[in-house]
Amino acid sequence: MKRVHVAAAVIRDASGKILIARRADTQHQGGLWEFPGGKVEPGEAVEAALARELQEELGIAVTAARPLIKVQHDYPDKQVLLDVWEVSAFSGEPHGAEGQPLAWVTARELADYEFPAANQPIVAAARLPAQYLITPEGLETPTLLRGMQKAVAQGCKLIQLRAPGGYDPQYRDLAVDAVGLCAGKAQLMLKGPFEWLGDFPSAGWHITAAQPVSYTHLRAHETKANL
């Protein structure tokens, strides 16, 4: 089965909201929401395909864009490669030139819309900030927590709590304090054994090269299920 190459866009307005479009009921994955874009023609550059599709679908001209993520996904009846770019500037007023409904949503609101399975990594990438903090090594716990608190107060939205010394009880205690500090203000990423997943449901998880695992395996640990 030939893989369909698609150029797609995460389009942001001046306030940071993201433009999504609803697929027609008659289309593949019809009725679900998606990030605008379309097929890359043979011999066509991805950036050129993206500009063409956004002009045809939305009536806008892209003036600033950068690569964001590539996603390969296999449906039972179709294989796709999504070449996703983040569009930060454009001219024209976006409208559904093909009759498709549009919506401007915040990154957090993306979770309220139903997307095709192939779009889920794009949703995750779109919700990540452009930069995030990785905590330094060698700091005493009070100093580290004060630094994290200051970063959150200054608008940092994602923090990775480094664990250079291994996953010992001291790191676990620090993680508990860090979760409380970030609650409702920033996303926290932890490192640790998968047995901890269910104890830190609000945190993200940084998986190292030494922890190869499937999504099913992660879900089993998170829900305490047996494989």
Walk through the language-model features, giving the residues of each.
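Conserved small/polar residues in nucleotide/adenosyl-binding loops
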Residues: 216-223
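NUDIX/MutT-family hydrolases
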Residues: 84-86, 94-127
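Active-site-adjacent beta-strand/loop module that shapes the phosphate/pyrophosphate-binding cleft
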Residues: 13, 71-93
